[in-house]
Amino acid sequence: MLTETEGRVAVKLARKTIETLLLGGRVPGPRDAGTDLPPVFGENRGVFVTLTEKGMLRGCIGHPYPDSTLEQAIIDSAISAAVRDPRFPPVGGEELESLIVEVTILTQPEKINAPPKELPDKVEIGKHGLIVKQGYCQGLLLPQVAPENEMDSIDFLGHTCMKAGLSPDAWAKGAEVYCFEGQIFKEKEPEGEVIEEKF
């Protein structure tokens, strides 16, 4: 778990990365934050960066698994959310002052070992994010997606399957389901105070 101070640093690092990319015209690297980072940023963590503009999703990409340091994962995810999310055109520099930056720090995903009919009871809305895998297909939804969209556990499982390109009931037909938890830090308003969001 990150402290509130570390969470603020995470969001500021994500925003600084996007600003450097869009206004400086170059791909940022480690230490572009211009400050010494707390030790936790040297630990390997999964992370997602989410960008919203006027309440609408503008980009969301991340590292589901702890395959790089938190610092590098935030930098990579911030760049990807801003200019590589295939669902949206790249963010422009003029949008920076209207974007809200959110960083979700993930725990290691763990497979839910339960018969399909018991899976909905194993999913805790507001606590768990989900990954569904079947063959070459994989989909992920962050923990905040279910409460923000008023989903129950069956809806959440179905939407995660669809994110993977599978039928909504694939979870009941042998797809592997993994859960993880997320710690969410976000700006209350563009470039504003950073808070920890809990559901």
Swiss-Prot record:
All residue ranges annotated as the AMMECR1 domain in the record: 5-196
InterPro entries documented for this protein: AMMECR1 (IPR023473), AMMECR1_dom_sf (IPR036071), AMMECR1_domain (IPR002733), AMMECR1_N (IPR027485), AmmeMemoSam_A (IPR027623), Uncharacterised_MJ0810 (IPR023472)
Signal sequence range: none
PROSITE patterns in UniProt: AMMECR1
PANTHER family: AMME SYNDROME CANDIDATE GENE 1 PROTEIN (PTHR13016:SF0), AMMECR1 HOMOLOG (PTHR13016)
NCBIfam families, per the entry: AmmeMemoSam_A, PRK00801.1, TIGR00296 family protein
HAMAP family reported in the protein's UniProt record: AMMECR1
The name this protein goes by in its record: Protein MA_3591
Organism of this sequence: Methanosarcina acetivorans (strain ATCC 35395 / DSM 2834 / JCM 12185 / C2A)
